[in-house]
A protein has these predicted regions:
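A structural signal for multi-pass alpha-helical bundles of membrane permease subunits
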Residues: 1-224
Length: 224
């Protein structure tokens, strides 16, 4: 959720300013979200295919070895003299989720940015505030409400996500989420009781999160 929101915040700050072709850039940023999930997942699977995928062709041309990004649980990575084990399939799915759903957060954040009165920023400039100070003390406090909403929504989306992961790799290599497990128990094993029990646990977790939001975050917003 944090990476998704930071990416959307950066994009919203960039396109908020007027520049040539801004409308076209805004439209292109919405493409991942409006693109059908079946088409998006298929394109990613083709690009990441270990045999004929374009990403692996680039890796081979750079002197690397072919990698099955969607079905390899982990991979060894050497960075600054340290050997790291990276959850490869999980990281790939997370990057796909960032790419696909950051336009959703982008729209929320951009709308809030455009609603902030320009007089605040102008007054800060007159007082000699730097761009960084204006962001931390004027812009960011105005965004806490929408960022908290996005966190709750994204957390809920992650728990309920089935189609993206199922189409990418079927939940293989450590990418299985609770909803995939529920579907597997229900359809694959016919274990209706276990599937229903897990679904109830999931619903309770989401209700607790929602109650926390309304009790603390939403109450603070109304007080302001």
């Amino acid at each position: 959720s944090a990476g998704w929101s930071l990416l959307a915040l950066w994009a919203a700050l960039v396109v908020k300013k007027a520049f040539l072709g801004r409308s076209m850039v805004r439209g292109l940023m919405l493409f991942p979200y409006v693109c059908p999930v079946v088409a998006a997942a298929l394109v990613w699977r083709l690009m990441l295919h270990p045999t004929f995928g374009v990403v692996n062709e680039w890796i081979v041309s750079a002197g690397g070895t072919r990698t099955d990004f969607l079905n390899s649980r982990s991979a060894e990575l050497s960075l600054l003299g340290f050997d790291l084990t990276v959850p490869l399939a999980l990281s790939t799915v997370i990057i796909f989720e960032w790419w696909r759903y950051f336009p959703f957060a982008f729209l929320f954040i951009l709308a809030r940015l455009q609603a902030i009165p320009a007089v605040y920023d102008e007054a800060a400039q007159v007082d000699g505030a730097t761009p960084t100070q204006r962001f931390w003390y004027i812009t960011l406090p105005q965004l806490w409400g929408v960022l908290s909403i996005l966190f709750v929504l994204r957390f809920s989306f992650t728990f309920n996500k089935v189609d993206d992961i199922d189409l990418l790799n079927g939940g293989a290599a450590g990418t299985q989420v609770i909803t995939i497990k529920i579907v597997e128990w229900l359809r694959g094993r016919g274990d209706i009781g276990s599937a229903a029990a897990l679904a109830i646990v999931l619903a309770v977790i989401l209700l607790v999160l929602l109650a926390f939001y309304f009790k603390f975050i939403h109450r603070d917003e109304e007080a302001e």
